[in-house]
Structures are given as C-alpha cells and as structure tokens.
C-alpha cells in the first residue's frame, strides 16, 4: 500500500470514526420513527376488514414483576424450568425446549456453533440466574372483556410425545372451563432454523368473544460496553417493516417505549452473529396494519407484534400462525428464507459493495474449504480488479516526479506571487498532459471497497471460529502469538522504504511511525482482518515494484 493510499485510508478511517461518535452523541444510533408512548398507554387499533371494531391494549406484563428492581427479579428464574414441565426437540441444527407452564419457547441451542472454540453448543435462548430470553404468544381479551385467558402460570396439556427429533410438531391445549379452548401448535423441520407457530381459539361458549393476538420475545440481556472495533456493530431490538429496517439500543428503551405499524415484515432481537425474529403473514394493502412494540417491561426488554382485534361469534374459531427464525446470520441461510431476514446484517453505508463481497468470499470458501485461503483469494481478486486504476495512479505519480525539477524552478521564479505560480504550474501540467489529481482519484475509488470488506470480515458469522492454519485456530479472534500483526507491520515498514521520503520533515516522521502505530493497533484485531491487510500490503508491494520497474524502461 503506497503512501497516498495509506494516508487516504487513515484519514478516511479517522473521519468516519469521528462522524460515528458525533452522530451517536447528537442523535439516536438508528431511529424507530413510530409514535413514542408512555409505558402503559396504547392506541385503539382498527379492526380487520371483516370484523367490527373493538378496543384493546398491548399485552400486559405477565410475570407480575413490573414494580420489582431488575436485581431482585433476576435473583431467581422467571419461569419454571423443572424437567417435568419441559418438552424437548432436536434437529441437525438446533436443540430446544418448550415449557408447559405458559406454553413458551424457553430454550434454543445451536449445535453447529459453540460458545468458545472447541466448547459446547452456544445457548442462545434460555433461563438462567443472570439472563433470560424466551418467546411467547397467544390470545388476550379486549378491554372490558372478562374472558379467562391463559397467562404465565397456566399449565398447558400436551397432546402427543414429550420429545421429538428430526422433524415434528407439539400440540398444547388448555380449556378455561367456560366453553373456550386454546390450542398451540409448534412445528419444526430437519435442516432448518425456521419454526412455525399456530395459535387457535375455539369459542364453544354461548357468546361472541372480542380478542386480539400477540406474539413477543422477552429478554434480560447481559449488556457489555462495546469496544472501538465494535462501534458500528448494532445489538438489540430490531425490525424490518414496510421495506425499512428499524433498530434501537437497549439503553434507549429504558427511557421510552416505541411503536410501529406495518402490513408485513419481521421483528425480534439481533446480536452480532445471531438473530431471533418473528415473521407475520403479510396483510393485504387495504387492511389495517398490525402494530409492533419495543419497550422495557422491567426487568425484560420486549419486542412484539399485535394483530388487529377480532370478534369470534359463538361456535366459531380463530387461528393465527406466524414463523420464527432463530439462528445464525449466515447470508445464504437468511436469503433462502425469502423473508428479508438478510436485512438484519447492517453493513453500513457501503452495503451495496459488502453484500457481493461476502458472496464472493463464501464462493471461494466453498472451493478451498478454508476461510483464510478464501480471504487471500478475495484480496487477490480485488487487487486484479483495481490493477488498471493502480497502474494509472503510479504512472501519474511518476509523471509528477519527473516534473519536480521544473516545479522547483517555477517556485524560485514565482515564489512570492501565488497567482502567477498557480498559472505557471497549470500551463506546465497542460503542456505535459499531467493531471495532478491523477494519483489520488483512483485511490479514493478503492477506499469504499476497503471499508466494505472490513465490515464483511468483522460481521460475518462465517468467520466465527473459522480456522486458518498452523497457529491461527480462529479467524474472528486475535492472533494468539501476534505473528500476523508483526508481519503486517514489517510489510508496512518495507513499503515506506520503497516510497520516496516526504519533503516535509513532519510528514516524514509521521510516515516513519505509522508502521509501529498500526502494528500496536492491529494486535487486538481479529486475525482475519490482519490477514487481509497483510496480504494486501504484500500484493501492493509486488504491484508497485512491477509497475515502477516497467516504467523505468519506458521513454520519458
């Protein structure tokens, strides 16, 4: 990487980082543009097209802990996790559990992803003394109705087996004793992170019922402060509605509740590598939109959706089904769902470049079966793609270098008159057909590609625990022996020797210390990123040497 490229990237990195800090301080990191409401308030929904209007509210807190401090609430499990109350299911990708108490999904382990390298399967959802993460859904009566509905303590009855493998369906039933039967079906398939949930209400009573359906995630997360490297890594409540992504931090939801409306999309919790999302069936454009909510129901953060209220006549029934995706944010897996789940990966401003880059990276890995080698091949492909631009840049730099003696003469002749000096230099450039910006513009074009690739390597779950070779067991972790950062620093030092020494003494000192600064900074970077930078430097050195040698034999 030549001096101009390095300077441009460093300046761009500093400016982008400073801008992100400013925007995070000045404005929320991302907006939920819906109406802000106070806790406990809700607006009356419009009915489905085929029903009469009835008023309702958002699902109330069901643990009865709304007034408790978070520390008190977390000191004991929120849900009965007794083995007798749990139903277990397993396919080739996940192992999970449902609780008969409350009819909730209370556990989800990813069998192909471990908590640490060589460790046990990562537990993404579950109940513990420190954190909890579960999903629930069902029907609730509209305001003013006295229907006895299932709650957090309801013990559902299982129809069928208590444990399923490969593929299957659990059926839970609860009769309220007043002629109303509630049913819940949870189904899963082999080789999939998608689950289907169907809630049914059978009205065998003598009166019509006014109800609404809700589904929600509740989570008590362990919130860690983010490092500088993870400034752009969003983790928290997220939704994709009406063709737009909405996201908000946990801290923001402690101050205010947020609401949105939409005819289709998904909502849930997004982590760096994993996603839990509820996907409702799309509504027709003429229908009233469903409502989505994001709030802090102490000690839980809640993300959910509420269907429009509906009246069920006596002797009739109602069924509402939706999909759950709970799995890793692998771009190929998300796109196969055809549910726009890939929008949960935020590549930032340069997403239009990052998305094809991650696909090319995955293609190379499918061929060589090693993401480290895939990074090398991708870096080589990018270098080949930009070779014409680099060639133009080096040629422009060489032409400017040849004009340097004449420029010095002009400085001596017109040094005290800036206007005449500029006019003389422009004539000189025109005479020799040299563009003074010719060496910079090709480099500026490459900077977005660099940042896009940075995001790809930093956010891709495919990099998590992916080995390279020898001493690199995990491309998403730092080099345990600092070999790659030291090699990278050495390559930068070699580059500085290939480039001419800057005439400005201060700039010369900065360029001399840059390899040391970057080496120290890269010590804690994921080894996959350091590998990219090292390979890029080696290829740049080779490229620069080749072009300069070729130009030495060309006539001036």
UniProtKB/Swiss-Prot annotation:
Record key words, sorted: Cell inner membrane, Cell membrane, Chaperone, Membrane, Protein transport, Transmembrane, Transmembrane helix, Transport
Stored Gene3D superfamilies: 2.70.98.90
Compositionally biased region (Low complexity): 42-55
Main location: membrane
Disordered: region residues: 36-74
GO cellular component assignments: plasma membrane
Membrane topology value: Multi-pass membrane protein
Protein transport as UniProt keyword: yes
InterPro entries: Membr_insert_YidC, Membr_insert_YidC_N, YidC/ALB3/OXA1/COX18, YidC/Oxa/ALB_C, YidC_ALB_C, YidC_periplasmic_sf
Subcellular location: Cell inner membrane
GO biological process, one term: protein transport
Pfam families hit by this protein: 60KD_IMP, YidC_periplas
TM segment ranges: 5-25, 370-390, 441-461, 468-488, 510-530
Keyword NADP: no
GO function terms (MF aspect): membrane insertase activity
Coiled coil: none
PANTHER family reported in the protein's UniProt record: CYTOCHROME C OXIDASE ASSEMBLY PROTEIN COX18, MITOCHONDRIAL (PTHR12428:SF65), OXA1 (PTHR12428)
Entry function: Required for the insertion and/or proper folding and/or complex formation of integral membrane proteins into the membrane. Involved in integration of membrane proteins that insert both dependently and independently of the Sec translocase complex, as well as at least some lipoproteins. Aids folding of multispanning membrane proteins.
Subunit record text: Interacts with the Sec translocase complex via SecD. Specifically interacts with transmembrane segments of nascent integral membrane proteins during membrane integration.
Matching HAMAP family: YidC_type1
Family recorded in the similarity comment: Belongs to the OXA1/ALB3/YidC family. Type 1 subfamily.
Name of the protein: Membrane protein insertase YidC
Name of the gene: yidC
